[in-house]
């Protein structure tokens, strides 16, 4: 008798995706972050659902409802901090996942890569709207500053901003619609993740060597299921340590003050995972230029397949590009630090230099290094 998992219409799909999936035998722990992102999404949807049961999206009661969740709801504090810090874990996994894709040349799977970029934008939009919901000072002013950037769009900008706000400022209408979008988007992310996997399974996974691994495949279960579970346990350990010992370490103290349109905080800044993009935005003195740089800082990923000049796929055997990759990582950490600093000397110039370096490495230096390495290896 054939196994039910191979014949049943629904189980068959799961079997081909997670059980009998042929997987390269040499993929390292950097390949764990896809499944970790899946776990993060499940945690966020589960905790978010329970938070939504007690939250009210009204400017007069939003802040109080979050306080009520933390004080009066059974384990409400746990759910709230798991959700807030779960977002940080989500972005840590996202950045590593994208970094792995760049390092090992996974962007050559163009469809998978492009869906991934759409996923990144969607997750960023969801996180931004979620940050507005507690209706603290940084929620309100963050929403005001970031939505206001759209007014830089010529001709339709101002109309567009007021349309998003649902009025002439960030107010009740804005909060209500942000809550609605924040609730629906994670389900769209889940659907996109399925499409992401669908395209990945058309080609099969990449591997650290960048070579074709068809000759050496192993079943996903039990080898990689057990490996993924180990990764999940380690991530849960990190998340729960954060939640139980230092839940506010990544948050902004200003968000414990209820939103007040009459009082601007001295330093308006987004959550830590947006600081690199915020630093790039601020490094250009022109509003429209800054907005374009902000969008391009992420959209530049879509150019990766076109900018690939080397005959070799990954960076495993390419020391020059390897060095550039790690300089890029250091540069992004520098930008993250600058994004959290006030706009004054020397931070302005450091931010501008780091922004120039960011675009130069991706657009000019890495493609050049690829050509040089091919010449050295006599591949061209």
UniProtKB/Swiss-Prot annotation:
Protein's name according to its UniProt entry: Cytochrome b
Residues the record lists as binding heme b b566: 97, 196
Domain of life: Eukaryota
Quaternary assembly: The cytochrome bc1 complex contains 11 subunits: 3 respiratory subunits (MT-CYB, CYC1 and UQCRFS1), 2 core proteins (UQCRC1 and UQCRC2) and 6 low-molecular weight proteins (UQCRH/QCR6, UQCRB/QCR7, UQCRQ/QCR8, UQCR10/QCR9, UQCR11/QCR10 and a cleavage product of UQCRFS1). This cytochrome bc1 complex then forms a dimer.
Cofactor: heme b
Protein species of origin: Gymnuromys roberti
Protein location: Mitochondrion inner membrane
Main location: mitochondrion
GO CC, one annotated term: mitochondrial inner membrane
InterPro entries, sorted: Cyt_b/b6_C (IPR005798), Cyt_b/b6_C_sf (IPR036150), Cyt_b/b6_N (IPR005797), Cytb/b6-like_sf (IPR027387), Cytochrome_b (IPR030689), Cytochrome_b_C_euk/bac (IPR048260), Cytochrome_b_N_euk/bac (IPR048259), Di-haem_cyt_TM (IPR016174)
UniProt-recorded Gene Ontology molecular function terms: metal ion binding; ubiquinol-cytochrome-c reductase activity
């Amino acid at each position: 008798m054939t196994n039910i998992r191979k014949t049943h219409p629904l189980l068959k799909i799961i079997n081909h995706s997670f059980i009998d999936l042929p997987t390269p035998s040499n993929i390292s722990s950097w390949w764990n972050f896809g499944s970790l992102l899946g776990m993060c999404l499940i945690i966020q949807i589960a905790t978010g659902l329970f938070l939504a049961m007690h939250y009210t999206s009204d400017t007069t009661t939003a802040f109080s409802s979050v306080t009520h969740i933390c004080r009066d709801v059974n384990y409400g504090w746990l759910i709230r901090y798991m959700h807030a810090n779960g977002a940080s874990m989500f972005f840590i996994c996202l950045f590593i996942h994208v970094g792995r894709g760049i390092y090992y040349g996974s962007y050559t799977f163009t469809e998978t890569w492009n869906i991934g970029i759409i996923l990144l934008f969607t997750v960023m939009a969801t996180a931004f709207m979620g940050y507005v919901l507690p209706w603290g000072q940084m929620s309100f002013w963050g929403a005001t500053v970031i939505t206001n950037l759209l007014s830089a769009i010529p001709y339709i900008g101002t109309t567009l901003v007021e349309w998003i706000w649902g009025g002439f400022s960030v107010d009740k209408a804005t909060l209500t619609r942000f809550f609605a979008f924040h609730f629906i988007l994670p389900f769209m992310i889940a659907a996109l993740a399925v499409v992401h996997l669908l395209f990945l399974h058309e080609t099969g996974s990449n591997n650290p060597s960048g070579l074709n691994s068809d000759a050496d495949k192993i079943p996903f279960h039990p080898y990689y299921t057990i490996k993924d579970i180990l990764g999940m346990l380690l991530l849960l350990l990190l998340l729960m340590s954060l939640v139980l010992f230092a839940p506010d370490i990544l948050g902004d103290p200003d968000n414990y003050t209820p939103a007040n349109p009459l009082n601007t905080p001295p330093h308006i800044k987004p959550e830590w995972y947006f600081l690199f993009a915020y630093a790039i935005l601020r490094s250009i003195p022109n509003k429209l230029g800054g907005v374009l740089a902000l969008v391009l800082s992420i959209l530049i990923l879509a150019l990766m397949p076109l900018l690939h000049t080397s005959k070799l796929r990954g960076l495993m055997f390419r020391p020059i590009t390897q060095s550039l990759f790690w300089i890029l990582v250091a540069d992004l950490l520098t930008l993250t630090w600058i994004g959290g600093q006030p706009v004054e000397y020397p931070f302005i110039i450091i931010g501008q230099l780091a922004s120039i370096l960011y675009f130069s490495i991706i657009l000019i230096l890495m493609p050049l290094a690829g050509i040089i390495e091919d010449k050295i290896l006599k591949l061209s």
